[in-house]
């Protein structure tokens, strides 16, 4: 055999079987950076139609987690696939750099501004800290194989971006959407600042739930409303609340106008009294109050009780009964304690009735000095004292501990309060912003489509947006207000542009350094500078304008796609929609795609305390970024994305299958020069034509899946092709022809041409997902080519070949099915020790007329398809008793061990082995391939 071994075309490639990704990927990254790969891609798409995916900026604080990786990898897959489709798809990563979390980190290091350090110095420290965080995160993102303008990202703290944020606010003002008001806002007493909706998390909390009686100022008159004359006992209206600390700010009792309310009399502790309760809640309430028997004196609608007055339980004034749509009978008494300074619904209904917006609570959550009974106490600690006072006054009907969902600060994880403070708001309704935003939502494509109804509900129900914060590190609200009237300066828009010009040169510190007289001249004494900063959600929400509209690589095209986690409907998607609609009357995006959160194998959130956190850095250092990228692509991101070590190891197994396929292709293209060896598709062996046609059809399916952002479909189709049509069928069949046919002969070159087309197509299919591996394959493909696959478009060499009808796709699928049945029977014969390998087998196929015609069409080449030394086709009716039934009703099989001699070169057992004297151990086919013109293959 040693003499003939060198006549075989054995596969050879530098592409290693083991990826060794953790070590090789960083080397590739160095080359990408050195070669300026991102700029090469940009240069290759000059003048093409833009596709703009705008990066939602992660916060510049801490290391990236697996959720960040999912987000960036999904974006990278889209950008690369759009580039492959011929678009000019720049990717400019960004970071959110202002705000409280950075302030808190810097405070730990240098103290609060105004203590050991000035506010200006504090801002500079914040800027330095954010820059350090950006650098750390940037390296981690680059390690994932994400291509972008990493050396020139956008930062919300860039002077130019800070200036453009101010300019965007001036447009919002110009459009009439900004107003100042005293309204209850989410307030964190630990932050000492208002919070945005997106900065609020809901966690379970135990609160005191109390039922409180408000005695009527005129009980006889109130009883008369229920048809009871000359009533002589006290009548009380009862509220239920879980925030006793808000009772000092109570200014009304809210009822539902259409709800039925009952006047219920009972005796307790020797005292007869009557309570007003929602009719449907009477039984549950009296059970809470341990009332065993009662009498319903009368019933009336809530509307009949409007403006009836009741005594505040411990303060010296009366409060009216008012009507509100927010009152329900889900819990409590059907009557709502109303404190306009401590609740959004309370505020809205209070405005209708002109109620005082009382706020006895300071920034730190402590009652102000003039608060009767509770001055100087923290509101949450005062709850017990409020309850004790109510008990003392005889107003407490019930008190229990109540577990419920309650808003918490996203940063401190502590309960927050609603608190009325003077703030700046973007109005939802004064100039039709809500209505227009809802129209724009309809014009946007939401992926998955449930995103539309989700954000619609949020926009329908959201309050005005409080955009002001009382912080140090943030973009200032650069306004001058009249000291007496609190009105904006009439030239606010032009003044803001002048301030923006200064910020563009000096950063936000320019505002605090500014002497009002520099801009206002003699008017300076009449106005004061606003010291509030913008909500950081305004910073990121305005980047469609402050960044995309400002950077030249976006060509003024506008944004095609926003892509973030599903929590961003109330976050970045919402803030961007509000600002863009306020500025321009339209949404800032055409498509919005959301992905689910990452959870562990048991569906639990990642948590350090549980110990189920999977850090992307650990994955890339152990398995490589391509494994992480494959997991992201293969997971349906529309729901929760499950990840664990076991799941990642399965991804590694799937990766190996793709890698092994690529290695087979490259190894068998050794010595192939497409410039001179490529066989035209129409001249190929039929099986080669078929596989090229399958690849062409698959490419269309893969491109469509990429276009629809269905990356799990891409990976499914790719794995199916590698495993079934290639691995189990085509590649298995062509090994014999590839290794044993004449090196330069048509049979082998036809096969290599098909492999070349598949490799050229496949390297592009995998490039958006398995970027490192695609680059590795690309460098080893034969033929003249550009330096990188990432500058290419989808492969154009796959012609959709029209096969003869007898060799249609269905025909080859039928042969694949037959081959699978033959393999089963051969495998059983192997287990029974009747044969060794499949080439020791002779197979007899008993087939019906239709199948017989199909099988005999390719003549003697059927044995190559079946990987047997001999294949005979006989009528199904002639099947012997030993014939094995198959899952195909039209086919029975007999497998026998060949009695013919084994060819030393191709290992086929053939009767003609030894018939040629010069090569006594070879079959005639091998002799032809060694010394003659090479065998002729027509079909397989």
Swiss-Prot record:
The protein's Enzyme Commission number: 6.1.1.5
Protein keywords: Aminoacyl-tRNA synthetase, ATP-binding, Cytoplasm, Ligase, Metal-binding, Nucleotide-binding, Protein biosynthesis, Zinc
Reaction equation(s) it catalyzes: tRNA(Ile) + L-isoleucine + ATP = L-isoleucyl-tRNA(Ile) + AMP + diphosphate
SUPFAM superfamilies: Anticodon-binding domain of a subclass of class I aminoacyl-tRNA synthetases (SSF47323), Nucleotidylyl transferase (SSF52374), ValRS/IleRS/LeuRS editing domain (SSF50677)
Sequence motif: 'KMSKS' region, positions: 605-609
Domain of life: Bacteria
Binding site for Zn(2+): 903, 906, 923, 926
Keyword Protein biosynthesis: yes
Family per record: Belongs to the class-I aminoacyl-tRNA synthetase family. IleS type 1 subfamily.
Function: Catalyzes the attachment of isoleucine to tRNA(Ile). As IleRS can inadvertently accommodate and process structurally similar amino acids such as valine, to avoid such errors it has two additional distinct tRNA(Ile)-dependent editing activities. One activity is designated as 'pretransfer' editing and involves the hydrolysis of activated Val-AMP. The other activity is designated 'posttransfer' editing and involves deacylation of mischarged Val-tRNA(Ile).
Entries under HAMAP family matching the protein: Ile_tRNA_synth_type1 (MF_02002)
Free-text comment about domains: IleRS has two distinct active sites: one for aminoacylation and one for editing. The misactivated valine is translocated from the active site to the editing site, which sterically excludes the correctly activated isoleucine. The single editing site contains two valyl binding pockets, one specific for each substrate (Val-AMP or Val-tRNA(Ile)).
NCBIfam families in the record: ileS
Name the UniProt record assigns to this protein: Isoleucine--tRNA ligase
Annotated source species: Shewanella sp. (strain W3-18-1)
């Amino acid at each position: 055999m040693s003499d003939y071994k060198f006549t075989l075309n054995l596969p050879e490639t530098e592409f290693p079987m083991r990826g060794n990704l953790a070590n090789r990927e960083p080397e590739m990254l160095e080359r990408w950076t050195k070669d300026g790969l991102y700029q090469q891609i940009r240069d290759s798409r000059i003048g093409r139609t833009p596709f703009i995916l705008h990066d939602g900026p992660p916060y510049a604080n801490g290391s990236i987690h697996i959720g960040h990786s999912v987000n960036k990898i999904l974006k990278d897959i889209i950008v690369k696939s759009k580039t492959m489709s011929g678009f000019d798809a720049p990717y400019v990563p960004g970071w959110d750099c202002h705000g409280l979390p950075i302030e808190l980190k810097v405070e730990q290091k240098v103290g609060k501004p105004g203590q050991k350090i000035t506010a200006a110095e504090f801002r500079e420290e914040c800027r330095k800290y954010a820059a350090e965080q950006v650098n750390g995160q940037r390296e981690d993102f680059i390690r994932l194989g994400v291509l972008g303008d990493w050396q020139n990202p956008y930062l919300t703290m860039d002077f130019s971006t800070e200036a453009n944020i101010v300019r965007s606010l001036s447009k919002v003002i110009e459009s009439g959407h900004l107003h100042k008001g005293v309204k209850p806002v989410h307030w964190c007493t630990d932050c000492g600042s208002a919070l945005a909706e997106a900065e609020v998390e809901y966690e379970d909390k135990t609160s005191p739930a109390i039922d409180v009686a408000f005695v009527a100022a005129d009980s006889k008159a109130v009883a008369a409303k229920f048809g009871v004359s000359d009533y002589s006992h006290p009548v009380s209206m009862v509220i239920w609340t879980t925030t006793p600390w808000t009772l000092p700010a109570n200014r009304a009792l809210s009822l539902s106008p259409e709800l039925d309310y009952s006047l219920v009399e009972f005796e307790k502790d020797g005292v007869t009294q009557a309570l007003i309760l929602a009719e449907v809640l009477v039984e549950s309430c009296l059970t809470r109050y341990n009332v065993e028997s009662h009498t319903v004196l009368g019933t009336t609608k809530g509307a009949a009780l409007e403006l009836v007055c009741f005594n505040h339980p411990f303060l010296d004034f009366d409060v009216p009964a008012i009507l509100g749509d927010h009152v329900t009978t889900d819990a409590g008494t059907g009557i709502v304690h109303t404190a306009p300074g401590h609740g959004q619904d309370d505020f809205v209904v209070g405005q209708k009735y002109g109620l005082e917006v009382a706020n006895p609570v300071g920034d730190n959550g402590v009652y102000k000095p003039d608060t009767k009974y509770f001055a100087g106490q923290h509101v949450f600690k005062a709850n017990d004292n409020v309850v004790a006072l109510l008990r003392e006054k005889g107003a407490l009907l019930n008190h229990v501990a109540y577990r419920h969902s309650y808003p918490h600060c996203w940063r401190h994880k502590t309960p927050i309060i609603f608190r009325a403070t003077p703030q700046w708001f973007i109005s939802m309704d004064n100039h039709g912003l809500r209505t227009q935003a809802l129209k724009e939502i309809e014009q946007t494509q939401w992926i998955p489509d449930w995103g539309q109804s989700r954000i619609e509900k949020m926009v329908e129900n959201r309050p005005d947006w409080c955009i002001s914060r009382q912080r140090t590190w943030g973009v200032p609200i650069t306004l001058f207000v009249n000291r007496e009237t609190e009105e904006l300066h009439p030239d606010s828009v032009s003044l803001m542009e002048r301030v923006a010009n200064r910020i563009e040169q000096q950063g936000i510190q320019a505002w605090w350094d500014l002497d009002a007289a520099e801009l206002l001249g003699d008017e300076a004494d009449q106005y004061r500078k606003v010291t509030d900063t913008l909500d950081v959600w305004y910073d990121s929400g305005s980047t469609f304008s402050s960044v995309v509209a400002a950077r030249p690589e976006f060509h003024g095209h506008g944004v095609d796609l926003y892509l973030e986690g599903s929590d961003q409907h109330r976050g970045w998607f919402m803030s961007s929609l509000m600002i863009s609609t306020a500025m321009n009357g339209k949404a800032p995006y055409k498509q919005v795609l959301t992905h689910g959160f990452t959870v562990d194998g048991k569906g639990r959130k990642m948590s350090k305390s549980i110990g189920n956190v999977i850090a992307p850095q650990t994955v890339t250092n152990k398995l490589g970024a391509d494994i992480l990228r494959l997991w992201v692509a293969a997971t349906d991101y529309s729901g929760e994305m499950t990840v664990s070590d076991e799941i990642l190891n399965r991804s590694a197994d799937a990766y190996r299958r793709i890698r092994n396929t690529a290695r087979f292709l490259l190894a068998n293209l050794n010595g192939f020069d497409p410039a001179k060896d490529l066989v035209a598709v129409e001249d190929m062996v039929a099986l080669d034509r078929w596989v090229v046609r399958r690849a062409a059809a698959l490419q269309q399916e893969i491109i469509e899946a990429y276009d629809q952002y269905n990356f799990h479909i891409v990976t499914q189709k790719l794995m199916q092709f590698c495993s079934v049509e290639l691995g189990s069928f085509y590649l298995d069949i062509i090994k014999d022809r590839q290794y044993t046919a004449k090196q330069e002969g048509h049979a082998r070159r036809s096969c290599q041409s098909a492999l070349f087309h598949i490799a050229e197509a496949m390297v592009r299919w995998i490039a958006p997902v398995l970027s490192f591996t695609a680059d590795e394959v690309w460098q080893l493909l034969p033929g003249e080519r550009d330096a990188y696959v990432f500058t290419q478009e989808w492969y154009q060499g796959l012609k959709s070949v029209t096969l003869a009808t007898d060799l249609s796709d269905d025909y080859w699928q039928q042969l694949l099915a037959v081959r699978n049945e033959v393999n089963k029977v051969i495998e059983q014969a192997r287990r029974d020790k009747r044969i060794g390998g499949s080439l020791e087998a002779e197979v007899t196929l008993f087939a019906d007329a239709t199948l017989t015609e199909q099988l005999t069409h390719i003549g003697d080449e059927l044995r190559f398809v079946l990987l047997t030394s001999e294949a005979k086709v006989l009528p199904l009716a002639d099947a012997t008793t030993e014939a094995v039934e198959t899952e195909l009703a039209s086919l029975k099989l007999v497998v026998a061990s060949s009695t013919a001699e084994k060819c030393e070169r191709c290992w086929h057992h053939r009767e003609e082995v030894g018939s040629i004297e010069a090569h006594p151990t070879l079959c005639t086919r091998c002799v032809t391939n060694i010394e003659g013109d090479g065998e002729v293959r027509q079909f397989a």
